[in-house]
């Protein structure tokens, strides 16, 4: 498979290059950057030296890029992919968008939260949370890769919603992200002196991943679900940790909870069910496509607390994109993604 990456110099883009380089059936075709056109990617990211010796191109010759590619990954901020997708409508080239442009069934929700007019509302995109929508991804031409917070948060509670074990009201998600989640562009809040030895909430009651999580929760619950979602910035490079709180329905047992998780995830290669009373740790998923999930019930409040963590650049972005590519092309779903986490 010939794979091209549009927006190859951002954190998600360069992570795609790392994973594609180690993929047994993928060949990197074209890599682009509008701000660094003509430069060698290895000069910007020396860890790629000797492995990926390609120069960055402009994406202006989009039709030519598509002709040279079996699949195009778009790793650009929101607002760009919809233009690319619209231009390539009818092309044989498959598209996987790592941004937010195609994640919503109702494009008006996108416009409300992203404050951008959607330019490709007629697109037929599949939401690419692979473990939940594998069959749809398999036949897709355009896949919307989920967000990092959303992947972690959705996987945490969907089994409990599907099997009607928790109330749909009062769900609270307290999530934390490493600084790479904010992207590579220069921001005062992402500077070393701002992040180091500090911890803060941001996007309170306004984060764009909120409606994305609600959309999938509602689909599995069979009714509208509204959540309280608060993200925080951790002084670490990588990782997403979501602590999710929900009220258990009357009479629900620990055995039913475990059965629900096993029913949905027991055979999933990348989801590691740690079980009751186990608190997952970011260090155990770093650099990998794994999802580590643990939970505990609180008899005092009648709530369940689900703790879930992923690497935001792998399962939360590039890794899941490669996983979707594998499914789209009918090859081993774990191809190129079997790396163990980096410990220490």
Please place each PLM-identified region on the residue numbering.
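N-terminal Rossmann-like NAD(P) cofactor-binding subdomain of oxidoreductases
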Residues: 1-197, 202-204, 296-300, 343-344
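Conserved active-site and cofactor/substrate-binding residues in soluble primary-metabolism enzymes
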Residues: 11, 79, 124, 151-155, ...
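Glycine-/small-residue-rich active-site loops that bind phosphorylated ligands and cofactors
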Residues: 149, 249, 313
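C-terminal helical cap and adjacent loop that interface with cofactors, partners, or active-site loops
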Residues: 263-265, 282-344
């Amino acid at each position: 498979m010939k794979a091209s990456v549009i927006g190859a110099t951002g954190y998600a883009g360069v992570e795609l290059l790392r994973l594609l380089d180690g993929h047994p059936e993928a060949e990197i075709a074209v890599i682009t950057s509008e701000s660094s056109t003509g430069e060698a990617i290895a000069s910007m990211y020396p860890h790629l030296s000797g492995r990926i010796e390609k120069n960055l191109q402009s994406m202006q010759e989009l039709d030519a890029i598509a002709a040279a590619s079996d699949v195009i990954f778009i790793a650009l901020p929101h607002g760009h992919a919809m233009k690319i997708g619209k231009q390539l409508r009818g092309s044989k080239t498959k598209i996987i968008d790592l941004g937010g442009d195609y994640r919503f069934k109702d494009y008006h929700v996108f416009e409300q939260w992203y404050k951008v007019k959607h330019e490709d509302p007629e697109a037929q995109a599949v939401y690419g949370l692979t473990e939940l929508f594998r069959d749809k991804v398999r036949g897709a031409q355009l896949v919307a890769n989920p967000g990092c917070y959303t992947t972690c948060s959705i996987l945490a509670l969907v089994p409990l919603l599907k099997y009607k074990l928790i109330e749909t009201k009062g769900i609270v998600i307290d999530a934390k992200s490493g600084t790479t989640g904010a992207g590579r562009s220069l921001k005062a809040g992402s500077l070393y002196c701002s992040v180091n030895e500090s911890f803060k909430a941001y996007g309170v009651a306004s984060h764009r991943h909120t409606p994305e999580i609600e959309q999938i929760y509602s689909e599995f619950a069979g009714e509208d679900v509204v959540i309280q979602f608060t993200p925080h910035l951790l002084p670490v490079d990588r990782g997403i940790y979501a602590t999710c709180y929900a009220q258990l329905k009357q009479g629900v047992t620990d055995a039913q909870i475990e059965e629900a998780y096993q029913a949905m995830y027991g055979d999933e290669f990348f989801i590691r069910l740690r079980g009751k009373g186990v608190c997952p740790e970011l260090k155990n998923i770093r650099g990998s496509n794994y999802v580590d999930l643990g939970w505990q019930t609180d008899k005092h409040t009648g709530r369940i607390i689900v703790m879930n963590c992923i690497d935001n650049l792998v399962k939360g972005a590039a890794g899941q994109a490669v996983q979707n590519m594998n499914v789209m092309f009918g090859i081993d779903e774990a191809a190129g993604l079997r790396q163990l986490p980096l410990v220490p």
